[in-house]
Amino acid sequence: CAGENAGVIKMVADSKMLGEVVVKSSLPKTILKNGGITTTVAESVLEKAGTMEHLLDRIPNVSAQNGNIAVFGRGEPIIYINGRQMRDRSELDRLSSDNIKSVEVISNPGARYAASTKAVIRITTKKIQGDGFGFDATTEGSYDEKKNMGGYGRLNMYYRKQGLELGAYAYGAKQSSPDEKDLQQMTYLDKTWNQQDKTRWKNKTETFSSRLNISYQFDNNNSLGASFSFLRNPKLITDGKTEGSVLRDEDLTETNTSIRSEFGQNSNLSSNIYYVGKVGKLGIDFNTDWFWSKGNNKNNIDEHYQEVNSDMQNQLVNSTTSKYNRLIASKIVLSYPLLGGDLSVGGEYSFTNRNTNYAIIPNTLADNVRDRIKEGMSAAFVTYSRDFGKLNMEAGLRYENVDFKYYDDGKYMAEQSKTYGDWFPSLSFSMPIGNVQMQLSYAADIDRPNYWVLRSGVQYSNHYTYETGNPFLVSEISRDISYDLAYKWLTFNLTYEHVSDPIYQTVEMYKDNATIGLMRMINGKSYNNVSSMLTLQPTFG
């Protein structure tokens, strides 16, 4: 300004028309590296998926429905959240899709993971910025065409001050779901027996869980934290009936109805302590878990069966089961840059103590069980990864020792007590070619028979089916070569596996009674299997 207003800054009003601003979420990015497929969730359309189940069901190679999570061709995965193994299913319930940064799916886990692991899902959450107090609350209800009602509510609170973070979480849910199955069992002897069952059950579950956590971030490279969780299922209910018939050479010989009423309760306590940091160039990742659980179950079965031209017969079977479990597990991974790549050396140890009591009335039908198992697992592993231009290579080797001791009514059972020691190599290559990403990996996994399938006793299932174990089972080992390809919203997988000593279930005649099947596990002949999968996830609009 001039004159007497010289040196005075004057602001003059003006107006500008802003153009229309459209904010769009992008397609999720997919990265193939180190044996896994990583999908970016943050700032993509997947952020709007809602619950973790809805999110995981939209991740390539994953199916998540009705509380069941599976990796295609591999089965139920082990889940890690921010590098820590999830041991309580309710941990997923406290997350939602808008909290997630990325999800990695590993269909062929390498040396870092327990050899019994078929698949791994690693979930990384967003880091919340800023200090102060905050909370979020969510509630949801559902009602389907079969009159199944359910719903949940959750509250998550946190307080942050500089590097300190305190958190508290509470969750409650009530769910109702059907369990419907139609089964047919054929037994070929001197005559052909055909058993047909139509099962219509309803499961009802009530859940309450809570969690307290504390963490402190010393700097960008070092953080320490601990958490304590509680889970309670005050009601685990199954009600319903099974209707069946028995045919002999296509002639009806018997009809039956089984009315089932089951009530259970379960309680879990767990805690975790972790440290992630660096000392110079040495990276340290340590965590330890403690887990305790106790559960009981009462099962009442009212059976009515009638042979042709005979009177109706009735049998009431009552059984009770109680379980008590303890677990402590620790794992440490040390990493260091070496020869242009990254070398990781690690070890882990876990100890499990399980107690099971099973009683049945009348006890002439099957054996009462009072058993205990002590299982120790120790492992050491090494992995090395390096980039050669666009080509990424990761190689690993793991040694695992498992020792479990089985006690029947306090008596040590040598036949069912086992010690295993095995080596497991792994190797993966990944490389982008233009817009196409490709990955080739090799790994092996093992299915060791647990004490329950090694048992000698017989357990009553229903009037026509008993169950037992097989003390002579050996471990099933699968060696897999997997090829993955990703292009925009398309992913493709081709897997070849060689399975040695596969474990599967068979049904035999029980005590020369063709109408009663005895189910048990056996080892079959080795076989080869090839599977492929194509996932298309385009986004419209």
Residues covered by each model-derived region:
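Outer-membrane beta-barrel translocator domains and adjoining extracellular loop/strand segments
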Residues: 116, 148-149, 179-191, 237-254, ...
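Short acidic/polar hinge/loop motifs at secondary-structure boundaries
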Residues: 58, 84-110
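Outer-membrane beta-barrel signature, preferentially recognizing the C-terminal barrel domain
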Residues: 369-375, 415-418, 446-500, 517-539
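Face-selective signature of the C-terminal outer-membrane beta-barrel domain
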Residues: 209-234, 259-409, 430-439, 492, ...
